[in-house]
């Protein structure tokens, strides 16, 4: 800390952009600005690296990475006079004052500079004020000061010798002891002392005192004397004090010390009552990218590395580690309360996390933990998990009066047995912006390649046996907090702005190995569960067995990029999509209709928006316009899919599709909707959707009375859509001379063995030589490929009259059902 008596030099910690100048000065050129670190300082240039906002305030224009302080000091020139007197000039008081002030400034700065140098302390010694003294010469006399390098060089051999000797030495007070035998002679024996007090090896016989001592020294020794294999905050002492309840004591350091001790000893931490926490001991890292692009994309010139994002942190009370086990006496007994209040607290980087959980590899690895039997009250974020939660267990957890129950980078094989939430948002998994490549393969992940796609933050096999969620109305201050929380998540976690290309002000690479578009963030509040894949990697097997919700302004569940294995099996969903629950399902009280959702309207069913399946649900108080679905098994009727809604808007009831992992092709088969059903003609490759018609062309032949004739143009175009084949035949004949009653037929390979039934086809015929009032119908025999022309619906074959016909055009369009 700088001496408070120093007036012409001020230092500020970095982090802000604008800084005050607390002292007066005669000219801006007498003010100097520096970036300072413990080992470096850099003077900044006015205009290009900082500018004046006002006479008493400056604004930085450069990055402060690598420095921890901003220093502003006055350095008045002793040679460059502000006022210069000459003979015969008018002598004014103002000039005299300025001249005197310049001298005073110089003297004041000299005094401040002296106070920053080595100065006498009260006891007569010299005080360097905690600064490093450099350029010290090699000591000559025993009383001379020595450099660290000199001391290290002199002490190192001695320390090595002492350490080597002490490793083979037993020490006693006031006497010498004799040397022990070698290691091979004392292995497996205890150390005893003879009558003279010298150490001697002792054989540890079974059942002897010596044997007991060996067992007590083992890893299970505590169990032999009735010891406990756990720790509690009540066992800990902090600054000589023990934990006391009911007196407003901050319990955070007692709990953290117990967590640290439990982690060190690999034993659980037991929480048995109510705890209050105020101090935020930890800085939890928020997501950021390192600025790098996939090296091959940089090498080919399409992309380049950019500056890394600034590392920001969220304040946290408690830190859990890999394999931490926290066991409460039950969520009705073991409570832990923070200070965040929905009615008064802000939403920002200082809003506290209760449980910050991170493993040794951070966001490039997994973390496993157990959290049971605890009620968390008044935390902005209940659990904040850096890395992929792997095989973690949560049970009997309650979160009350929180902003977000959980924010997690990802989950794999994590089970949540009973989770009860009263908060603006439930558990939010995924969506962390941790790298800037538009891809989701490991080779595209920093440090190129990563051992797995940790930075994508996937969510697979996350199961909730029972999840209860109660939200808050979108009204008054609660409406503001809803918006603040979604904005916080977008600003610091999801970072929608980063999805734009660099040239558009974002951070996404220009090149892509991602066949799918990056997802759009929806509002995270007013939902029990939110799963999103930031880079479009698929999420699979995320299941909620039983869901109970009350007051969800949005669809209670949201999942994107998920497979059909993601399901909510049973649900009771009450008061959905209402602005105020007490006002009921009435006009003017619908969120998303009467109040526009800033993050986009819900498009899925009320139980589950995005992708996934909601199997059974009971809905009370439903916002109109959004459907609900059930899938139930009826006795004697197989599987029945039920659907209902409060409007008649057209919507999908059921879709069937299949996926071929070998060819990476996803084909949509059938789409059943409320007003029609169809077979969708699309399939999806990694490069996007393609038409999935079976189609082709062939060359037909034209015959008159069975004899083939020459034509100028003949082509058949055919394609298949579901169970229907459609065939279009086009023929041009420049000139043809016919005898009376001549029959013209067309043979096309497109029909080989394909016609299912004999008789007339469904189609039309255009013939340029037809006279008015005559219509023709195309006919094909079963299994044949010859098209004959008949008059209207009669069996009469159309026959040409004798004569020469020029510029004949024949067009036949026919639909038929194929045999296969």
Curated annotation (Swiss-Prot):
Principal cellular location given in the protein's record: virion
A single BP term in Gene Ontology: symbiont entry into host cell via disruption of host cell envelope
InterPro entries, per database record: Phage_T7_tail_fibre-like_N
UniProt keyword terms in alphabetical order: Degradation of host capsule during virus entry, Degradation of host cell envelope components during virus entry, Host-virus interaction, Viral attachment to host adhesion receptor, Viral attachment to host cell, Viral tail protein, Virion, Virus entry into host cell
Subcellular localization: Virion
Superkingdom of source: Viruses
GO cellular component, one term: virus tail
Assembly: Homotrimer.
Family: In the N-terminal section; belongs to the Teseptimavirus fiber family.
Domain notes: The N-terminus anchors the RBP to the virion. The central part and C-terminus probably binds and degrades the host exopolysaccharides.
Its job: Functions as a receptor binding protein (RBP) and probably mediates the attachment to the host capsular exopolysaccharides. Displays a depolymerase activity that specifically degrades the KN1-type polysaccharides of Klebsiella pneumoniae capsule, which allows the phage to reach the host cell membrane and bind the entry receptor.
Name the record gives this protein: Depolymerase, capsule KN1-specific
Lineage: Viruses, Duplodnaviria, Heunggongvirae, Uroviricota, Caudoviricetes
């Amino acid at each position: 800390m700088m001496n408070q008596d120093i007036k012409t030099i001020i230092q500020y910690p970095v982090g802000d952009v604008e800084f005050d100048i607390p002292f007066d000065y005669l000219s801006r050129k007498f003010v100097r600005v520096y970036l300072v670190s413990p080992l470096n300082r850099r003077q900044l240039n006015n205009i290009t690296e900082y500018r004046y906002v006002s006479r008493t305030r400056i604004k930085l224009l450069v990055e402060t990475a690598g420095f921890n302080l901003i220093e502003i000091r006055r350095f008045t020139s002793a040679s460059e006079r502000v006022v210069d007197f000459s003979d015969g000039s008018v002598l004014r008081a103002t000039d005299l004052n300025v001249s005197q002030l310049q001298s005073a400034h110089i003297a004041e700065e000299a005094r401040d500079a002296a106070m920053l140098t080595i100065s006498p302390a009260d006891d007569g010694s010299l005080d360097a004020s905690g600064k490093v003294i450099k350029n010290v010469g090699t000591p000559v006399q025993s009383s001379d000061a020595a450099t660290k390098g000199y001391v290290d060089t002199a002490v190192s051999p001695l320390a090595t010798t002492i350490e080597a000797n002490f490793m083979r030495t037993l020490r006693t007070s006031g006497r010498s002891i004799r040397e022990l035998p070698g290691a091979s002679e004392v292995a497996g024996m205890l150390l005893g002392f003879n009558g003279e007090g010298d150490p001697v090896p002792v054989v540890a016989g079974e059942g002897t005192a010596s044997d007991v001592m060996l067992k007590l020294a083992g890893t299970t020794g505590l169990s032999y004397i009735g010891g406990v294999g756990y720790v509690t905050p009540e066992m800990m002492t902090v600054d000589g004090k023990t934990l006391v309840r009911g007196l407003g004591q901050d319990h955070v350091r007692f709990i953290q010390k117990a967590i640290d001790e439990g982690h060190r000893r690999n034993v659980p931490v037991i929480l048995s009552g109510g705890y209050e926490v105020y101090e935020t001991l930890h800085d939890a890292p928020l997501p950021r990218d390192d600025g790098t692009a996939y090296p091959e994309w940089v090498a080919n010139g399409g992309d380049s590395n950019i500056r890394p994002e600034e590392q920001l942190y969220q304040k946290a009370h408690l830190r859990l580690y890999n394999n931490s086990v926290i066991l409460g006496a039950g969520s009705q007994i073991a409570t832990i309360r923070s200070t965040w209040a929905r009615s008064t607290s802000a939403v920002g980087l200082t809003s506290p996390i209760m449980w910050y959980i991170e493993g040794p590899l951070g966001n490039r690895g997994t973390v496993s933990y157990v959290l049971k039997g605890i009620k968390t009250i008044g935390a902005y974020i209940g659990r904040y998990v850096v890395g992929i939660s792997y095989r973690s267990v949560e049970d009997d957890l309650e979160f009350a009066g929180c902003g977000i129950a959980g924010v997690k980078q990802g989950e794999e094989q994590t089970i949540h047995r009973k989770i009860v939430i009263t908060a603006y948002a439930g558990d939010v998994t995924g969506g962390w912006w941790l790298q800037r490549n538009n891809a989701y393969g490991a080779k595209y992940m920093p440090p190129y390649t990563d051992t797995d796609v940790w930075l994508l933050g996937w969510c697979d096999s996350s199961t909730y046996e029972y999840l209860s969620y109660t939200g808050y109305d979108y009204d008054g201050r609660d409406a503001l907090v809803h918006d603040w929380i979604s904005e916080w998540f977008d600003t610091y976690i999801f970072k929608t702005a980063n999805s734009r290309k660099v040239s558009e002000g974002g951070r996404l690479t220009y090149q892509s190995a991602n066949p799918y578009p990056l997802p759009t963030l929806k509002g995270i509040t007013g939902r029990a569960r939110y799963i999103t894949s930031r880079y479009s990697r698929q999420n699979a097997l995320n299941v909620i067995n039983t869901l109970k919700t009350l007051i969800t302004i949005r669809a209670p569940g949201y999942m994107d990029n998920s497979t059909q294995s993601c399901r909510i099996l049973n649900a009771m969903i009450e008061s959905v999509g209402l602005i105020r629950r007490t006002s009921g399902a009435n006009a003017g009280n619908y969120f998303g209709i009467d109040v526009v959702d800033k993050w986009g309207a819900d498009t899925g069913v009320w139980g589950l928006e995005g992708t996934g399946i909601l199997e059974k649900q009971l809905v009370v108080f439903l916002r109109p316009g959004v459907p609900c679905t059930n899938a139930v098994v009826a006795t004697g009727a197989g599987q029945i899919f039920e659907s209902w809604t409060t409007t008649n808007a057209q919507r999908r009831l059921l879709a069937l599709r299949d996926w071929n992992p070998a060819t990476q092709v996803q084909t949509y088969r059938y789409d059943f909707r409320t007003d029609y059903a169809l077979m969708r003609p699309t399939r999806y490759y990694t490069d996007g959707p393609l038409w999935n018609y079976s189609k082709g062309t062939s060359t037909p032949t034209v015959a008159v009375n069975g004899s083939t004739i020459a034509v100028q143009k003949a082509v058949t175009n055919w394609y298949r859509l579901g169970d229907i084949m459609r065939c279009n035949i086009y023929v041009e004949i420049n000139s043809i001379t016919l005898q009376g009653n001549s029959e013209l037929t067309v043979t096309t390979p497109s029909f080989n063995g394909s016609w299912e039934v004999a008789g007339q086809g469904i189609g039309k015929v255009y013939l340029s030589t037809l006279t008015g009032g005559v219509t023709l119908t195309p006919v094909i025999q079963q299994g044949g490929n010859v098209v004959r022309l008949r008059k209207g619906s009669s069996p009469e074959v159309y026959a040409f009259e004798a004569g020469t016909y020029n510029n004949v055009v024949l067009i036949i369009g026919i639909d038929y059902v194929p045999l296969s």
